[in-house]
Every structure is written in C-alpha cells, then in structure tokens.
From Swiss-Prot:
The lineage of its organism: Bacteria, Bacillati, Cyanobacteriota, Cyanophyceae, Synechococcales. This is R-phycocyanin-2 beta chain. NCBIfam families: phycocy_beta. InterPro entries: Globin-like_sf, Phycobilisome_asu/bsu, Phycobilisome_asu/bsu_sf, Phycocyanin_b. Belongs to the phycobiliprotein family. (2R,3E)-phycocyanobilin binds at residue 82. SUPFAM superfamilies: Globin-like. The modification N4-methylasparagine is found at residue 72. The keyword Nucleotidyltransferase does not apply.
Length: 172
C-alpha cells in the first residue's frame, strides 16, 4: 500500500529525478482538501452499518431469489456472510479514500475475490449490484452538505465512486 506521498517519492526515485513542481502542486492540492477527505471517510465509517443494511435491503428487494430457499443469502448464516462481505468491501473503500490510493483494497480485498465467489457459487453480478447500491448510499451521505467542510466535493466524490466501481468490476 502506498499513500499518495510515498507513491510520488517512489516514482521520482525510479526516474532518478527530484519531485517535480507538478507533483508537489498535486500533493499540495490534496493536502488542502484533506479536511473534506477526512469528513468523507468519517461519514462513511460512522454510517457503515446503515449503508450496508440499506444496500442489502435494496438488493434483496431487487433480487428476491437470493433470500428465497436455495438462494445464496438464504439462512441466517449465509445472510450474515453476505453482510460481512459487503462491510469488508466498504471498509476497504474507506481505506482507499483515506489514503487516496486503491492499492490496499486491490491487494488485500479484491485480489482473488471473483475466483472465491465463483468457487462458492456466489453470483458475482449480485455482489456487484450490492457494491453499487453501497456506492449510491455512501455518495449520498458524502454529498450531504450539512456539517461538513465548505467547498466542492465533486472531485472527491468522483474519486470515491471509482473505488466502488473497482470493487464492483472485480467481482462481476
């Protein structure tokens, strides 16, 4: 896992060059927006159970076969595993948002996840739909202007959306 600063240093070192002005400017912009980033991560983390529960309710309403007898989320044990997996993915999205880098999510959460779900017979499209529903819920919370740092959060919301998109694509 590399945070944005470590990544810039590693790239400059690999080139055998000093850190460029444009790289410094990009990092400075990231620092100036850090309060918005912290607010967003805090909002997702503080509302994680609501985000997961809301997404699960919507998913099971859209795909009732998942909770019907024989479905992948039928029985309380399977339902708990489904909710746990959704929560884990959401947690790694927050790690990526916090660091501004998806590598920790890729390495520790998504790497091999599709193959695991295939081996278990879990429909990847349903998992991806659940991730997209979490994305919608999380972005709605992030974009709620009440009680957050002033300023435009469109770029940060877009960035966080890409982390959800990566997670959904990795299991679909």
């Amino acid at each position: 896992m590399f945070d944005a600063f470590t990544k810039v240093v590693a790239q400059a070192d690999a080139r055998g060059q000093f850190i460029s002005t444009s790289e410094i400017d990009a990092l400075a912009a990231m620092v100036s927006d850090s309060n918005k980033r912290l607010d967003a991560v805090n909002r997702i983390s503080s509302n994680a159970s609501t985000i997961v529960a809301s997404a699960a309710r919507q998913l099971f309403a859209q795909q009732p076969a998942l909770i019907a007898p024989g479905g992948n989320a039928y029985t309380s044990r399977r339902m708990a595993a489904c909710l746990r997996d959704m929560e884990i993915i959401l947690r790694y999205v927050t790690y990526s948002a916090f660091t501004g880098d998806a590598s920790v999510m890729e390495d520790r959460c998504l790497n091999g996840l599709r193959e695991t779900y295939l081996a278990l017979g879990t429909p990847g499209a349903s998992v991806a739909a659940g991730v997209n529903l979490m994305k919608d819920a999380a972005l709605a919370i992030i974009n709620d202007k009440a009680g957050i740092s002033a300023g435009d959060c469109a770029s940060l919301s877009s960035e966080i959306g890409t982390y959800f998109d990566r997670a959904a694509a990795s299991v679909a």
